[in-house]
Regions:
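N-terminal pre-catalytic segment of deacetylase/amide-hydrolase enzymes
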Residues: 1-74, 82-90, 94, 111, ...
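His/Asp/Glu-enriched short active-site or ligand-binding loop at hydrolase and phosphoryl-transfer sites
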Residues: 5, 163, 171, 177-212, ...
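Active-site beta->alpha N-cap acidic-glycine motif
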Residues: 49-136, 147-150, 154, 160, ...
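A cross-domain feature marking catalytic cores of carbohydrate-active enzymes
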Residues: 76-78, 103-105, 127-129, 166-169, ...
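Divalent metal-coordination and catalytic microenvironments
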Residues: 77, 92, 101, 125, ...
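A short acidic, helix-capping loop that chelates divalent metal ions and anchors anionic groups
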Residues: 132-139, 226-229
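Charged helix-capping and loop-helix junction motifs
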Residues: 143-148, 202-207, 233-239
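Catalytic grooves of carbohydrate-active enzymes
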Residues: 210-260
Length: 286
């Protein structure tokens, strides 16, 4: 399991940068024309790393759980969707399975009853930014902070404070660590996905997931409406095949918080009685 956010200022990117400078300085006195190579390699890493959800180059990311048992966690991005999420919740109920929903703030604001339904059925909710801007990591630090904070404030109205943030499209940048440190949040990505392009490609979804699943997998799916007349029905069938396939392989579907050993969400506030608000009781517990 990749380590969670520890609040440390130095990241692998810092270490790589300092190392590149040191090696470059040494090469300058040995063979001047070679001095640029370490710096060029470092810049290449900086260009590629944002697009590697498991890399943890700019900050610690959690992309999987422990490998010591056949367990996996189901996560759903980009919702809630009034055409898709209710049927998905019924399917999860039928098999008594927990899931984590990384919700988009604007969709949560449009469909508050779906957030309440997700929570009342014992699932967890994470932060997936407010607008799901695929270019968010190219925006300013202020814009990035606003996107995450606005969603946190919105979800606090449901009695919860997500501790988990999943960046849109899984892309990170050097500004994200400071924002998450301020909000006391972890960056949680994934280790098993089907390349469904936000449910634009659902044919063979289950086959692709079951081929790539591994012990400790954080499975990425999307609860948004696919195209086509039978799109939603076909997608739900694929999700059910994933559930049945995991069971046939001996996997246990567990809450994400249990898989990674860290809280995914917590109560936003405690009522005067000191108890946990009803809407947040037993997150992800089935």
């Amino acid at each position: 399991m990749k380590r969670a956010f520890t609040g440390k200022i130095l990241s692998p990117a810092h270490a790589a940068g300092f190392s590149a400078l040191a090696v470059s300085g040494g090469l300058f006195f040995i063979r001047e024309e070679m001095a640029v190579a370490p710096l060029a390699l470092f810049l290449l890493f900086c260009l590629v790393a944002p697009f590697l959800p498991q890399a943890g180059f700019f900050l610690p990311v959690i992309s999987r759980g422990a490998r010591d048992r056949l367990a996996a966690a189901l996560t759903f991005d980009d919702g809630p969707d009034p055409d898709v999420t209710p049927g998905l919740l019924e399917l999860l109920d039928r098999y008594r399975l927990p899931a984590t929903f990384f919700v988009v703030g604007v969709e949560a604001e449009r469909h508050p009853m779906l957030i309440r339904e997700i929570l009342s059925r014992g699932h967890a909710v994470g932060n997936h930014s407010y607008h799901h801007d695929p270019l968010l990591m190219l925006r300013s630090r202020t814009r990035l902070s606003d996107e995450i904070t606005r969603t946190q404030e919105l979800l606090a109205g449901f009695g919860i404070r997500p501790r988990a943030f999943r960046p849109p499209v899984g892309i990170t940048n050097p500004r994200l660590p400071g924002v998450l440190r301020t909000l006391d949040m972890d960056c949680i990505t994934f280790s098993c996905r089907a390349g469904d392009f936000g449910n634009r490609l659902i044919r063979g979804l289950a086959k692709r997931i079951l081929k790539r699943v591994h012990p400790g997998a954080i499975v990425l799916l999307h609860d948004v409406a696919p195209s086509g007349v039978r799109g939603i029905a076909d997608w739900l069938e694929e999700v059910e095949q994933i559930i049945l396939g995991l069971k046939a392989k001996g996997y246990e579907v567990v809450p994400l918080s249990q898989l990674i050993g860290r809280p995914v969400m917590e109560p936003a506030t405690l009522p005067p009685s000191g108890g946990i608000p009803e809407i947040t009781r037993g997150p992800e517990e089935k």
